[in-house]
Amino acid sequence: MIRPALELDAVGLQIGGARILRDVSMQVATGEMVGVIGPNGAGKTTLFNIISGVAVPTSGRVLLAGDDVTGRRVHQRARAGLGRTFQTSSVFPGLTVAENARLAAQSKLGGATSPWRFPRADDDAHGVAMRCLEEVGLAHHAGTAAGVLSHGDKRKLEIAMLLATEPEVVLLDEPMAGVGSGDVAGLVEVIRRLHASGRTVLMVEHHMEVLLGLVERVAVMHHGELLAIDAPKAVMADPAVQKAYLGETV
């Protein structure tokens, strides 16, 4: 039996008297791309925080390829093959595009952890960085300061940095947030290639047209619970989803 790339087993989070997540369970197959949607405050980012180790669940388990990583820290999960981008930009604006990607590569190769101390002559990390920049179409900006990139190109750089850590499971947290309309198509193509490489992808995204055109299944979060998970057409036709997510009844 093939193990899921990612499994959530009755994951819950309680802070004080508030239940933030309630018994969320799902399995994501190797190479599958799943979208995560829901109203603001539904628990989407909290779920990503628990998967990536930023937050610790009060109940349940998180498994990567069958390995229980629930108690492991962020860097340990990264070593286990998990990568993530965030809603807000995570690039170092004062470093060049290549230096940002090289720093990410060194985190995987065991190099320096400070952006101001990494060895400039690290050929292995440089090679990985340039290959990843080529994959996202930013190699021609290698010497450009990351801070002057368009928002769409910053998102591409974040994906290049993620690729440099060689993840098997990827979490994309609202990659289209703040991206201008002229940059959307290029970023969508980068995400398509990321998925086509065989990686398992979970994506939170409010741009519904983009998300529904990319994913194989959609998971719907509502009040901290997993309301539904199915193929996009089935989910969007579900009366419970329409009522909870769209505020409508049918």
Segments from the language model and where they lie:
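Glycine-rich phosphate-binding loops of nucleotide-dependent enzymes
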Residues: 2-250
